[in-house]
Amino acid sequence: MDIVGGQNLRQMWDDLAGVYGDKTALIFESCEGIVRQFSYASLNEEINRTANLFYSLGIRKGDRVALHLDNCPEFIFCWFGLAKIGAIMVPINARLLGEESAWILQNSQVSLLVTSVQFYPMYREIRQDNSTPLNHICLIGEQLPADDGVSHFSQLQARQSATLCYTPALSTDDTAEILFTSGTTSRPKGVVITHYNLRFAGYYSAWQIALRDDDVYMTVMPAFHIDCQCTAAMPAFSAGSTFVLLEKYSARAFWDQVRRYQATVTECIPMMIRTLMVQPAAPTDRQHHLREVMFYLNLSAQEKDAFTERFGVRLLTSYGMTETIVGIIGDRPGDKRRWPSIGRVGFSYEAEIRDDQNRPLPAGEIGEICIKGIPGKTIFKEYYMQPEATAGALEPEGWLHTGDSGYQDEDGYFYFVDRRCNMIKRGGENVSCVELENIISAHPKIQDIVVVGIKDAIRDEAIKAFIVLNEGETLSEAEFFSFCENNMAKFKVPSFMEIRTDLPRNCSGKIIKKNLK
Protein backbone atom coordinates (compact mmCIF):
# COMPACT_ATOMS: atom_id res chain seq x y z
CA MET A 1 0.00 0.00 0.00
CA ASP A 2 1.61 3.25 -1.19
CA ILE A 3 0.38 6.05 1.05
CA VAL A 4 3.08 8.53 -0.04
CA GLY A 5 2.02 8.76 -3.67
CA GLY A 6 5.40 9.86 -5.00
CA GLN A 7 5.48 13.10 -3.00
CA ASN A 8 8.95 14.15 -1.84
CA LEU A 9 9.70 16.51 1.05
CA ARG A 10 9.92 19.59 -1.17
CA GLN A 11 6.44 18.96 -2.53
CA MET A 12 5.18 18.23 0.98
CA TRP A 13 6.19 21.63 2.31
CA ASP A 14 4.92 23.52 -0.70
CA ASP A 15 1.55 21.79 -0.28
CA LEU A 16 1.43 22.34 3.49
CA ALA A 17 2.11 26.06 3.07
CA GLY A 18 -0.69 26.31 0.52
CA VAL A 19 -3.23 24.32 2.53
CA TYR A 20 -2.57 25.59 6.06
CA GLY A 21 -1.11 29.05 5.39
CA ASP A 22 -1.29 31.14 8.57
CA LYS A 23 -2.06 28.20 10.87
CA THR A 24 0.66 27.74 13.53
CA ALA A 25 3.10 25.03 12.46
CA LEU A 26 5.98 25.36 14.94
CA ILE A 27 6.38 26.79 18.43
CA PHE A 28 9.82 26.70 20.04
CA GLU A 29 10.59 27.48 23.67
CA SER A 30 14.18 27.98 24.81
CA CYS A 31 15.59 27.18 28.24
CA GLU A 32 15.31 30.90 29.05
CA GLY A 33 11.61 30.88 28.17
CA ILE A 34 12.02 32.74 24.87
CA VAL A 35 9.28 31.64 22.46
CA ARG A 36 9.51 31.69 18.66
CA GLN A 37 6.48 30.86 16.55
CA PHE A 38 6.00 30.13 12.83
CA SER A 39 2.96 29.56 10.64
CA TYR A 40 3.03 26.93 7.91
CA ALA A 41 3.57 29.64 5.30
CA SER A 42 6.32 31.46 7.21
CA LEU A 43 8.07 28.21 8.15
CA ASN A 44 8.12 27.18 4.50
CA GLU A 45 9.71 30.55 3.67
CA GLU A 46 12.38 30.03 6.35
CA ILE A 47 13.05 26.58 4.89
CA ASN A 48 13.39 28.05 1.39
CA ARG A 49 15.78 30.75 2.59
CA THR A 50 17.88 28.10 4.30
CA ALA A 51 17.89 25.95 1.16
CA ASN A 52 19.12 28.98 -0.80
CA LEU A 53 21.76 29.61 1.89
CA PHE A 54 23.14 26.10 1.36
CA TYR A 55 23.06 26.56 -2.40
CA SER A 56 25.02 29.82 -2.03
CA LEU A 57 27.69 27.89 -0.12
CA GLY A 58 28.06 25.39 -2.96
CA ILE A 59 25.85 22.59 -1.66
CA ARG A 60 24.17 20.55 -4.40
CA LYS A 61 22.04 17.44 -4.66
CA GLY A 62 23.68 14.45 -2.96
CA ASP A 63 26.06 16.54 -0.83
CA ARG A 64 26.15 15.84 2.89
CA VAL A 65 25.80 18.57 5.52
CA ALA A 66 26.19 17.92 9.24
CA LEU A 67 24.07 19.54 11.97
CA HIS A 68 25.43 19.65 15.53
CA LEU A 69 22.65 21.49 17.34
CA ASP A 70 20.49 21.36 20.40
CA ASN A 71 16.77 21.75 19.78
CA CYS A 72 16.11 24.99 17.90
CA PRO A 73 14.05 26.21 14.91
CA GLU A 74 17.22 26.33 12.81
CA PHE A 75 17.40 22.54 12.98
CA ILE A 76 13.98 22.37 11.30
CA PHE A 77 15.01 25.00 8.71
CA CYS A 78 18.16 23.05 7.84
CA TRP A 79 16.56 19.60 7.83
CA PHE A 80 13.94 20.48 5.26
CA GLY A 81 16.02 23.10 3.47
CA LEU A 82 18.59 20.45 2.64
CA ALA A 83 15.84 18.04 1.57
CA LYS A 84 14.36 20.63 -0.78
CA ILE A 85 17.58 20.81 -2.80
CA GLY A 86 18.27 17.08 -2.63
CA ALA A 87 21.15 17.40 -0.16
CA ILE A 88 21.57 15.02 2.78
CA MET A 89 21.34 15.90 6.46
CA VAL A 90 23.80 14.23 8.83
CA PRO A 91 22.61 15.06 12.37
CA ILE A 92 25.21 14.67 15.10
CA ASN A 93 24.28 13.85 18.67
CA ALA A 94 24.77 17.14 20.49
CA ARG A 95 26.39 15.35 23.44
CA LEU A 96 29.19 13.78 21.40
CA LEU A 97 32.77 14.86 22.00
CA GLY A 98 35.47 15.75 19.48
CA GLU A 99 36.77 12.32 18.52
CA GLU A 100 33.28 10.90 18.07
CA SER A 101 32.06 13.87 16.05
CA ALA A 102 35.19 13.88 13.88
CA TRP A 103 34.64 10.19 13.14
CA ILE A 104 31.12 10.87 11.84
CA LEU A 105 32.34 13.77 9.69
CA GLN A 106 35.05 11.58 8.21
CA ASN A 107 32.81 8.56 7.76
CA SER A 108 30.13 10.51 5.90
CA GLN A 109 32.54 12.88 4.10
CA VAL A 110 30.86 16.07 5.31
CA SER A 111 32.33 19.33 4.00
CA LEU A 112 29.88 21.78 5.64
CA LEU A 113 28.71 21.90 9.25
CA VAL A 114 25.97 23.95 10.91
CA THR A 115 26.50 24.29 14.64
CA SER A 116 26.14 26.75 17.51
CA VAL A 117 28.79 28.91 19.14
CA GLN A 118 29.00 26.65 22.20
CA PHE A 119 30.26 23.73 20.08
CA TYR A 120 32.62 25.77 17.90
CA PRO A 121 35.84 25.30 19.96
CA MET A 122 35.59 21.55 19.41
CA TYR A 123 35.22 21.96 15.65
CA ARG A 124 37.96 24.56 15.44
CA GLU A 125 40.26 21.86 16.80
CA ILE A 126 38.86 19.24 14.41
CA ARG A 127 39.55 21.50 11.42
CA GLN A 128 43.23 21.64 12.38
CA ASP A 129 43.49 17.98 11.38
CA ASN A 130 44.39 17.92 7.70
CA SER A 131 42.52 14.64 7.19
CA THR A 132 39.11 16.12 8.00
CA PRO A 133 36.79 16.74 5.03
CA LEU A 134 35.22 19.69 6.89
CA ASN A 135 36.11 23.00 5.20
CA HIS A 136 33.31 25.37 6.21
CA ILE A 137 31.29 26.00 9.38
CA CYS A 138 28.06 27.98 9.55
CA LEU A 139 27.54 29.24 13.10
CA ILE A 140 24.36 30.07 14.99
CA GLY A 141 24.65 32.52 17.87
CA GLU A 142 26.21 35.81 18.88
CA GLN A 143 29.84 36.97 19.22
CA LEU A 144 31.07 34.89 16.30
CA PRO A 145 34.80 34.37 15.72
CA ALA A 146 36.43 36.03 12.72
CA ASP A 147 38.03 32.78 11.53
CA ASP A 148 38.49 31.71 7.93
CA GLY A 149 35.89 29.27 6.69
CA VAL A 150 33.29 30.43 9.23
CA SER A 151 30.05 32.24 8.37
CA HIS A 152 27.07 33.60 10.30
CA PHE A 153 23.93 31.52 9.70
CA SER A 154 21.39 34.22 10.53
CA GLN A 155 23.09 36.90 8.44
CA LEU A 156 23.44 34.61 5.44
CA GLN A 157 19.89 33.34 5.71
CA ALA A 158 18.40 36.84 5.98
CA ARG A 159 19.94 37.76 2.59
CA GLN A 160 18.25 34.88 0.80
CA SER A 161 15.04 34.91 -1.19
CA ALA A 162 11.96 33.18 0.23
CA THR A 163 11.51 31.58 -3.20
CA LEU A 164 13.54 28.45 -3.87
CA CYS A 165 16.23 29.13 -6.47
CA TYR A 166 17.56 25.57 -7.04
CA THR A 167 15.07 22.80 -7.78
CA PRO A 168 16.83 19.65 -8.97
CA ALA A 169 14.74 16.63 -9.88
CA LEU A 170 13.85 14.70 -6.73
CA SER A 171 12.59 11.18 -6.18
CA THR A 172 11.12 9.70 -3.03
CA ASP A 173 13.92 7.13 -3.30
CA ASP A 174 16.57 9.85 -2.85
CA THR A 175 18.48 9.86 0.43
CA ALA A 176 17.34 12.62 2.79
CA GLU A 177 19.38 11.76 5.87
CA ILE A 178 22.15 9.63 7.30
CA LEU A 179 21.38 9.16 10.98
CA PHE A 180 24.11 7.55 13.03
CA THR A 181 22.97 5.13 15.71
CA SER A 182 23.83 5.85 19.32
CA GLY A 183 26.68 3.33 19.45
CA THR A 184 26.38 2.43 23.14
CA THR A 185 28.39 -0.76 22.57
CA SER A 186 30.41 -0.07 19.40
CA ARG A 187 31.05 2.46 16.63
CA PRO A 188 27.78 3.94 15.34
CA LYS A 189 26.43 2.92 11.95
CA GLY A 190 24.95 5.40 9.50
CA VAL A 191 21.29 4.57 8.89
CA VAL A 192 20.29 5.75 5.41
CA ILE A 193 16.82 7.35 5.39
CA THR A 194 15.01 8.36 2.20
CA HIS A 195 12.40 10.98 1.36
CA TYR A 196 9.89 8.12 1.21
CA ASN A 197 10.91 6.94 4.69
CA LEU A 198 10.20 10.35 6.18
CA ARG A 199 6.93 10.87 4.30
CA PHE A 200 5.76 7.38 5.31
CA ALA A 201 6.77 8.05 8.93
CA GLY A 202 4.56 11.13 8.97
CA TYR A 203 1.47 9.29 7.80
CA TYR A 204 2.13 6.14 9.84
CA SER A 205 2.82 7.87 13.16
CA ALA A 206 -0.16 10.19 12.64
CA TRP A 207 -2.31 7.07 12.21
CA GLN A 208 -0.76 5.47 15.30
CA ILE A 209 -1.95 8.29 17.56
CA ALA A 210 -5.01 9.32 15.50
CA LEU A 211 -3.50 12.78 14.97
CA ARG A 212 -5.66 15.59 13.58
CA ASP A 213 -5.00 19.13 12.43
CA ASP A 214 -6.40 20.54 15.68
CA ASP A 215 -3.88 18.58 17.78
CA VAL A 216 -0.83 20.09 19.47
CA TYR A 217 2.13 17.71 19.64
CA MET A 218 4.73 18.74 22.22
CA THR A 219 8.13 17.09 22.54
CA VAL A 220 11.38 17.52 24.43
CA MET A 221 13.12 14.71 22.55
CA PRO A 222 16.32 15.84 20.78
CA ALA A 223 15.73 16.87 17.18
CA PHE A 224 18.74 14.87 16.02
CA HIS A 225 17.03 11.67 17.19
CA ILE A 226 14.68 9.43 15.19
CA ASP A 227 11.92 9.73 17.81
CA CYS A 228 11.65 13.49 17.50
CA GLN A 229 11.86 13.40 13.73
CA CYS A 230 9.64 10.46 12.82
CA THR A 231 7.20 10.03 15.70
CA ALA A 232 6.74 13.72 16.52
CA ALA A 233 7.74 16.28 13.87
CA MET A 234 6.81 14.36 10.71
CA PRO A 235 3.35 13.25 11.93
CA ALA A 236 2.61 16.71 13.35
CA PHE A 237 3.44 18.44 10.07
CA SER A 238 1.85 15.73 7.90
CA ALA A 239 -1.44 16.10 9.79
CA GLY A 240 -1.35 19.90 9.77
CA SER A 241 -1.03 19.93 13.56
CA THR A 242 0.98 22.36 15.67
CA PHE A 243 4.42 21.07 16.66
CA VAL A 244 5.83 22.38 19.96
CA LEU A 245 9.58 21.83 20.34
CA LEU A 246 11.16 22.51 23.73
CA GLU A 247 14.90 23.09 23.98
CA LYS A 248 15.43 20.93 27.07
CA TYR A 249 13.44 18.73 29.42
CA SER A 250 12.58 19.97 32.90
CA ALA A 251 10.44 17.81 35.19
CA ARG A 252 9.46 20.90 37.18
CA ALA A 253 8.36 22.85 34.10
CA PHE A 254 6.87 20.02 32.03
CA TRP A 255 3.22 20.17 33.10
CA ASP A 256 3.18 23.98 33.02
CA GLN A 257 4.39 23.75 29.42
CA VAL A 258 1.75 21.14 28.59
CA ARG A 259 -0.93 23.51 29.90
CA ARG A 260 0.58 26.66 28.37
CA TYR A 261 0.56 25.23 24.85
CA GLN A 262 -2.59 23.13 25.37
CA ALA A 263 -0.69 20.07 24.18
CA THR A 264 -2.84 17.06 23.31
CA VAL A 265 -0.06 14.59 22.51
CA THR A 266 3.48 14.14 23.81
CA GLU A 267 6.18 11.48 24.01
CA CYS A 268 8.23 10.32 26.97
CA ILE A 269 11.10 8.01 27.74
CA PRO A 270 11.08 6.07 31.05
CA MET A 271 13.47 8.53 32.70
CA MET A 272 10.98 11.33 32.09
CA ILE A 273 8.04 9.39 33.47
CA ARG A 274 9.99 8.45 36.59
CA THR A 275 11.16 11.99 37.26
CA LEU A 276 7.64 13.32 36.73
CA MET A 277 6.34 10.81 39.25
CA VAL A 278 8.73 12.01 41.98
CA GLN A 279 7.54 15.61 41.64
CA PRO A 280 5.26 16.72 44.50
CA ALA A 281 1.60 15.94 43.83
CA ALA A 282 -0.43 19.02 42.88
CA PRO A 283 -4.13 19.83 42.43
CA THR A 284 -3.31 20.65 38.79
CA ASP A 285 -1.93 17.17 37.98
CA ARG A 286 -5.00 16.34 35.88
CA GLN A 287 -5.67 19.85 34.60
CA HIS A 288 -4.44 19.51 31.04
CA HIS A 289 -5.55 18.50 27.53
CA LEU A 290 -3.20 15.55 26.97
CA ARG A 291 -4.96 12.52 25.54
CA GLU A 292 -1.97 10.41 24.51
CA VAL A 293 1.53 9.98 25.91
CA MET A 294 3.63 7.88 23.56
CA PHE A 295 6.35 6.08 25.48
CA TYR A 296 9.29 3.87 24.69
CA LEU A 297 10.68 0.85 26.55
CA ASN A 298 11.04 0.05 29.38
CA LEU A 299 8.52 0.60 32.14
CA SER A 300 7.04 -1.86 34.59
CA ALA A 301 3.28 -2.35 34.65
CA GLN A 302 3.20 -0.79 38.13
CA GLU A 303 4.90 2.37 36.86
CA LYS A 304 2.52 2.63 33.91
CA ASP A 305 -0.54 2.22 36.10
CA ALA A 306 0.70 4.75 38.65
CA PHE A 307 1.43 7.35 35.95
CA THR A 308 -1.91 6.98 34.16
CA GLU A 309 -3.82 7.06 37.45
CA ARG A 310 -2.08 10.17 38.75
CA PHE A 311 -2.14 12.28 35.59
CA GLY A 312 -5.24 10.90 33.87
CA VAL A 313 -3.61 10.17 30.52
CA ARG A 314 -3.35 7.20 28.17
CA LEU A 315 0.06 5.65 27.67
CA LEU A 316 0.63 4.41 24.15
CA THR A 317 3.41 1.85 23.77
CA SER A 318 5.66 2.23 20.74
CA TYR A 319 8.42 -0.25 19.91
CA GLY A 320 10.93 0.49 17.21
CA MET A 321 14.48 1.60 16.49
CA THR A 322 16.35 3.89 14.12
CA GLU A 323 16.33 1.19 11.44
CA THR A 324 12.54 0.76 11.56
CA ILE A 325 12.02 4.54 11.27
CA VAL A 326 8.79 4.37 13.32
CA GLY A 327 7.26 2.32 16.13
CA ILE A 328 6.37 -0.74 14.09
CA ILE A 329 4.80 -2.57 17.04
CA GLY A 330 2.58 -0.71 19.46
CA ASP A 331 -0.83 0.05 20.85
CA ARG A 332 -3.41 1.05 18.28
CA PRO A 333 -5.87 3.94 18.51
CA GLY A 334 -8.82 2.82 20.59
CA ASP A 335 -7.20 -0.48 21.62
CA LYS A 336 -7.44 -1.66 25.18
CA ARG A 337 -3.91 -1.83 26.60
CA ARG A 338 -2.70 -5.35 27.29
CA TRP A 339 0.34 -4.70 29.45
CA PRO A 340 3.03 -5.96 29.59
CA SER A 341 2.44 -6.47 25.86
CA ILE A 342 4.11 -3.91 23.58
CA GLY A 343 1.14 -4.15 21.22
CA ARG A 344 0.51 -5.47 17.75
CA VAL A 345 2.34 -4.96 14.48
CA GLY A 346 1.24 -1.90 12.52
CA PHE A 347 -0.01 -1.67 8.95
CA SER A 348 2.51 -2.20 6.12
CA TYR A 349 4.63 -4.48 8.33
CA GLU A 350 4.91 -8.14 9.26
CA ALA A 351 6.52 -9.47 12.44
CA GLU A 352 7.74 -12.89 13.52
CA ILE A 353 9.61 -14.48 16.40
CA ARG A 354 12.53 -16.57 15.13
CA ASP A 355 14.99 -18.99 16.68
CA ASP A 356 18.78 -19.05 16.33
CA GLN A 357 18.42 -20.97 13.04
CA ASN A 358 16.17 -18.20 11.67
CA ARG A 359 13.05 -20.38 11.85
CA PRO A 360 9.67 -18.97 12.94
CA LEU A 361 8.63 -19.91 16.47
CA PRO A 362 5.10 -20.62 17.71
CA ALA A 363 3.22 -18.44 20.18
CA GLY A 364 4.69 -18.32 23.66
CA GLU A 365 8.27 -19.20 22.72
CA ILE A 366 11.04 -16.62 23.15
CA GLY A 367 13.23 -15.76 20.19
CA GLU A 368 14.39 -12.80 18.12
CA ILE A 369 11.86 -10.19 17.03
CA CYS A 370 12.09 -9.90 13.23
CA ILE A 371 10.27 -7.28 11.18
CA LYS A 372 9.44 -7.30 7.48
CA GLY A 373 9.22 -4.01 5.64
CA ILE A 374 10.31 -2.45 2.37
CA PRO A 375 13.90 -1.10 2.48
CA GLY A 376 14.01 2.60 1.71
CA LYS A 377 10.26 2.92 2.17
CA THR A 378 8.90 1.47 5.43
CA ILE A 379 12.28 0.57 6.94
CA PHE A 380 15.76 2.02 6.45
CA LYS A 381 17.47 1.61 3.10
CA GLU A 382 20.91 0.44 4.26
CA TYR A 383 23.85 1.21 6.52
CA TYR A 384 25.94 3.90 4.86
CA MET A 385 29.01 2.39 3.18
CA GLN A 386 28.69 -0.80 5.25
CA PRO A 387 27.32 -3.55 2.97
CA GLU A 388 28.38 -6.35 5.32
CA ALA A 389 26.56 -4.79 8.27
CA THR A 390 23.52 -4.24 6.06
CA ALA A 391 23.52 -7.87 4.92
CA GLY A 392 23.87 -9.04 8.53
CA ALA A 393 20.78 -7.15 9.67
CA LEU A 394 18.58 -7.03 6.57
CA GLU A 395 17.57 -10.06 4.51
CA PRO A 396 16.99 -9.64 0.74
CA GLU A 397 13.25 -10.24 1.26
CA GLY A 398 13.07 -7.26 3.63
CA TRP A 399 13.24 -9.07 6.99
CA LEU A 400 15.09 -7.00 9.58
CA HIS A 401 16.76 -8.73 12.52
CA THR A 402 16.22 -6.41 15.47
CA GLY A 403 18.57 -8.10 17.94
CA ASP A 404 15.75 -8.02 20.51
CA SER A 405 14.28 -11.02 22.31
CA GLY A 406 10.53 -11.39 22.67
CA TYR A 407 7.51 -13.58 22.08
CA GLN A 408 3.94 -13.26 20.87
CA ASP A 409 0.69 -14.67 22.20
CA GLU A 410 -2.10 -16.46 20.35
CA ASP A 411 -3.85 -13.14 19.62
CA GLY A 412 -0.84 -11.59 17.89
CA TYR A 413 0.25 -9.34 20.75
CA PHE A 414 4.02 -9.05 21.14
CA TYR A 415 6.03 -9.00 24.35
CA PHE A 416 9.52 -7.56 24.68
CA VAL A 417 11.97 -9.55 26.81
CA ASP A 418 15.33 -7.83 26.30
CA ARG A 419 18.05 -6.91 23.90
CA ARG A 420 19.66 -10.20 22.95
CA CYS A 421 23.01 -8.67 23.86
CA ASN A 422 21.46 -7.55 27.16
CA MET A 423 20.98 -11.04 28.55
CA ILE A 424 23.19 -12.18 31.42
CA LYS A 425 24.44 -15.77 31.24
CA ARG A 426 24.52 -16.99 34.84
CA GLY A 427 25.35 -20.60 35.62
CA GLY A 428 23.55 -21.91 32.54
CA GLU A 429 20.53 -19.63 32.98
CA ASN A 430 19.68 -16.67 30.75
CA VAL A 431 18.67 -13.68 32.87
CA SER A 432 16.96 -10.65 31.34
CA CYS A 433 18.34 -7.34 32.54
CA VAL A 434 15.05 -5.62 31.74
CA GLU A 435 13.07 -8.11 33.82
CA LEU A 436 15.26 -7.47 36.85
CA GLU A 437 15.21 -3.71 36.34
CA ASN A 438 11.41 -3.69 36.17
CA ILE A 439 11.17 -5.67 39.42
CA ILE A 440 13.75 -3.62 41.32
CA SER A 441 12.32 -0.29 40.10
CA ALA A 442 9.17 -1.07 42.10
CA HIS A 443 11.12 -0.53 45.35
CA PRO A 444 9.74 2.72 46.82
CA LYS A 445 13.19 4.12 47.64
CA ILE A 446 14.66 3.56 44.17
CA GLN A 447 14.45 6.21 41.45
CA ASP A 448 16.60 4.57 38.77
CA ILE A 449 18.19 1.15 38.31
CA VAL A 450 20.31 -0.73 35.82
CA VAL A 451 21.78 -4.22 36.08
CA VAL A 452 24.82 -5.52 34.22
CA GLY A 453 26.70 -8.76 33.96
CA ILE A 454 30.26 -8.87 35.25
CA LYS A 455 32.76 -11.68 34.78
CA ASP A 456 32.51 -14.55 37.23
CA ALA A 457 35.00 -17.43 37.20
CA ILE A 458 32.40 -19.92 38.40
CA ARG A 459 29.05 -18.88 36.95
CA ASP A 460 30.11 -17.19 33.69
CA GLU A 461 28.63 -13.89 34.84
CA ALA A 462 27.52 -12.36 38.11
CA ILE A 463 24.80 -9.73 38.34
CA LYS A 464 25.50 -6.23 39.60
CA ALA A 465 22.86 -3.57 40.23
CA PHE A 466 23.62 0.16 39.97
CA ILE A 467 21.02 2.20 41.85
CA VAL A 468 19.98 5.84 42.10
CA LEU A 469 17.85 6.55 45.18
CA ASN A 470 15.02 9.02 45.55
CA GLU A 471 16.14 12.25 47.18
CA GLY A 472 16.73 11.91 50.92
CA GLU A 473 16.47 8.10 50.97
CA THR A 474 18.99 5.55 52.26
CA LEU A 475 19.09 1.85 51.42
CA SER A 476 21.21 -0.82 53.09
CA GLU A 477 22.57 -3.84 51.24
CA ALA A 478 20.56 -6.11 53.54
CA GLU A 479 17.33 -4.30 52.68
CA PHE A 480 18.09 -4.36 48.97
CA PHE A 481 18.98 -8.04 48.77
CA SER A 482 16.01 -9.00 50.93
CA PHE A 483 13.69 -7.18 48.52
CA CYS A 484 15.24 -9.01 45.56
CA GLU A 485 15.02 -12.41 47.23
CA ASN A 486 11.33 -11.86 47.94
CA ASN A 487 10.50 -10.82 44.38
CA MET A 488 12.55 -12.97 42.01
CA ALA A 489 13.99 -16.43 41.53
CA LYS A 490 17.16 -17.09 43.49
CA PHE A 491 19.38 -17.35 40.41
CA LYS A 492 18.24 -13.86 39.34
CA VAL A 493 19.15 -12.10 42.60
CA PRO A 494 22.08 -9.69 42.04
CA SER A 495 25.36 -10.53 43.73
CA PHE A 496 26.46 -6.90 44.04
CA MET A 497 24.87 -3.49 44.38
CA GLU A 498 26.27 0.02 44.10
CA ILE A 499 24.48 3.27 44.90
CA ARG A 500 25.27 6.20 42.60
CA THR A 501 24.06 9.77 42.24
CA ASP A 502 23.27 9.22 38.54
CA LEU A 503 23.70 6.77 35.66
CA PRO A 504 25.59 7.46 32.43
CA ARG A 505 23.16 8.07 29.57
CA ASN A 506 23.29 9.07 25.95
CA CYS A 507 21.08 11.81 24.51
CA SER A 508 18.18 9.42 24.01
CA GLY A 509 18.08 8.47 27.65
CA LYS A 510 19.61 5.06 27.05
CA ILE A 511 21.99 3.97 29.78
CA ILE A 512 25.53 3.44 28.49
CA LYS A 513 26.26 0.12 30.14
CA LYS A 514 29.81 -0.13 28.85
CA ASN A 515 30.66 2.78 31.17
CA LEU A 516 29.51 0.75 34.17
CA LYS A 517 31.18 -2.60 33.66
Swiss-Prot record:
Class of enzymatic activity (EC top level): ligase
Superkingdom of origin: Bacteria
EC number: 6.2.1.48
Pathway it works in: Amine and polyamine metabolism; carnitine metabolism
One term of GO molecular function: crotonobetaine-CoA ligase activity
Family: Belongs to the ATP-dependent AMP-binding enzyme family.
Identification of the protein by name: Crotonobetaine/carnitine--CoA ligase
Organism of this sequence: Salmonella choleraesuis (strain SC-B67)
